[in-house]
């Protein structure tokens, strides 16, 4: 059968940085430290470069079939990704010397409630990118962690209104503890509440080229532990009350959240990182953002 990619001349010559496919539907079994291998449904991208200037194109079917083998016959881990990248290059000998595989998927994790004995599922968006260039493999991991952020300014303003209401109600009275507690338990007592919003920490890290396993769960857990207010799964009343307490004791502007995560990542063994904090404001019609990078030469840029 005719092979146009090999035999037909290019209409115009020139090298290309990446050629391949995107939005490939691909279920696969994902391996990560801390969980049993789990089947996820991903959208994949697969690319090689084209450094032969007069080549008509690449062999996309070879990339597709290599991913299909990864999906149906293997589990996704650093070793199998390295094998797939090597095949991308070897199957394009003379055409390509760089390759990329990217998976976007949601990782389901069981999450315990704060105080009750309940648990539920939470899904975490993950992007796993692997590349090879000049024989060197690089892995990059991106996760989104959703949490609640309560505005420190709004909390201060709410406290002031509560103080004013208290002074107005009891300005001329000697107050017993019982009366104070009863009043604080009414809507008249708590006349204002601070605003909070669902927020997302998007964190991207570069992994060591020699890793033998991915550890997505540890990255997610350490971020949630640092922020203190991750969005919950199963919730009973005691859990909701504890969540309210945690929000009140961990007030955060986007700058605060970014500095927390930056300080956390500095203690880890990642060669580089990039983070963006997104506070989807409930007061404003716009979002509040903060971005930070490790700052290594030639690394991620803000």
Curated annotation (Swiss-Prot):
Coiled coil: none annotated. The record marks 151 as: May be catalytically important. Pathway: Cofactor biosynthesis; 7,8-dihydroneopterin triphosphate biosynthesis; 7,8-dihydroneopterin triphosphate from GTP: step 1/1. It catalyses: GTP + H2O = 7,8-dihydroneopterin 3'-triphosphate + formate + H(+). The keyword Hydrolase applies. Its EC number is 3.5.4.16. GO terms for molecular function: GTP cyclohydrolase I activity. One of its GO terms (biological process) is tetrahydrofolate biosynthetic process. Keywords: Hydrolase. It comes from the Bacteria. Gene3D superfamilies: Urate Oxidase. Pfam families: GCHY-1 (PF02649). The keyword Hydrolase applies. It is an enzyme of class 3 (hydrolase). Converts GTP to 7,8-dihydroneopterin triphosphate. Belongs to the GTP cyclohydrolase IV family. PANTHER family: GTP CYCLOHYDROLASE MPTA. This is GTP cyclohydrolase FolE2.
């Amino acid at each position: 059968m005719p092979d146009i990619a090999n035999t037909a001349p290019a209409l115009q010559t020139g090298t290309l940085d990446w050629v391949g496919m995107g939005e490939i539907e691909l279920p696969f079994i994902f391996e990560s430290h801390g969980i049993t291998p789990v089947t996820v449904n991903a959208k994949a991208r697969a690319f090689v470069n084209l450094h032969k200037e007069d080549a008509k194109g690449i062999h996309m079917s070879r990339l597709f079939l290599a991913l299909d083998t990864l999906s149906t016959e293997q589990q996704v881990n650093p070793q199998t990704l390295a094998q797939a990248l090597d095949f991308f290059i070897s199957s394009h000998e003379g055409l390509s010397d760089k390759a990329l595989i990217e998976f976007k998927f949601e990782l389901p994790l069981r999450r315990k409630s704060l105080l009750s004995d309940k648990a539920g599922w939470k899904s975490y968006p993950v992007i796993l990118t692997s590349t090879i260039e000049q024989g060197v493999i690089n892995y990059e991991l991106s996760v989104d962690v959703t949490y609640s952020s309560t505005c420190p300014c709004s909390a201060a303003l709410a406290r002031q209104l509560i103080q004013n209401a208290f002074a107005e109600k009891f300005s001329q009275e000697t107050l017993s503890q019982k009366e104070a507690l009863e009043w604080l338990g009414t809507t008249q007592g708590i006349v204002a509440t601070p605003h909070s919003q669902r927020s997302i920490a998007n964190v991207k890290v570069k992994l060591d080229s020699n890793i033998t396993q991915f550890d997505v769960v540890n990255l997610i857990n350490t971020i949630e532990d640092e922020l203190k207010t991750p969005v919950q799964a199963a919730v009973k009343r005691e859990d909701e009350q504890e969540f309210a307490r945690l929000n009140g004791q961990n007030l955060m502007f986007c700058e605060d959240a970014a500095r927390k995560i930056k300080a956390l990542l500095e203690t880890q063994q990642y060669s580089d990182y990039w983070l963006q904090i997104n506070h989807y404001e409930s007061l404003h019609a716009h979002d509040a953002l903060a971005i930070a990078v490790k700052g290594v030469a030639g690394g991620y840029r803000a």
